[in-house]
């Protein structure tokens, strides 16, 4: 019964949005932001459950990658909209980078930490041991993170970045697809969908994709614009609203799905979904921004980042480095999760250039310290580095 209520509730939010959208029932920016945001929120749940069911038909690692990709589709829609508008109005470039950097930092600082802390609170396990098959995610996250430092250095996002990052994403998906296939254990709404049989579950999945996809497509622009209008109305800095509130709405279903995995004791699936999402955001999402900008602008000119945007990118890259070092030994402890969360929270309130530089340097210093003083972390990081091939003979 609970699963039915979850499904009905999730279906109701995008369905209600269609009524609002086509009748113009919402009044004012707050009402429009609430209605469109709720549609994106509900669609995120539907897409996550559909992607969980996909594990019945494809390798587990690929299913987790697809789950992560689909689960962040709401944020992709909002961020790509900002990048598209930036091609017509350069002021929107700041919002595109704000949403992307905020989403990435929320994913690691809140999502990753919540996964481990839930396992500890519910099952009294002080650490998560990652399966070796998640080396795929860790290796590609290392590659994408290393490349991400080039973006603040050159101060632009260009079509060349799109080509490189899209190639990384495709390589990651292919690598995930070669992983061993395991039959998943489904619970809740995803288990209810799976009970419909092969034809039934695929039909329901297609219906979910159509409903949720349509809701996200029609709600992305109203949500983005109404959020900016709310900031102007209540004198809240628009950059911060877009950086934290927009990704919080679009990524909340993903966080909740990961926490539900953790509550069931499925630690590997919980953190695996979130690490896959981080890879997807650093590759496909970041790569999509200059492509959308170029198409809208009608030229191959790059998106030019100002000083604040470059600092935000650097801070986001530094956080990824620290997170990578933490999980490079395939073990994620309660203490490490608390540190990740504790380092993230001050960023919500300390927004000066000095604070951004300070946080970035602190992440990098802590990562270096762990590598220096932890033999297991040092071995894990060494395994992430490319090795020269030995010549035969």
Give the positions of each predicted feature.
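Hydrophobic alpha-helical segments, chiefly the membrane-spanning helices
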Residues: 1-393
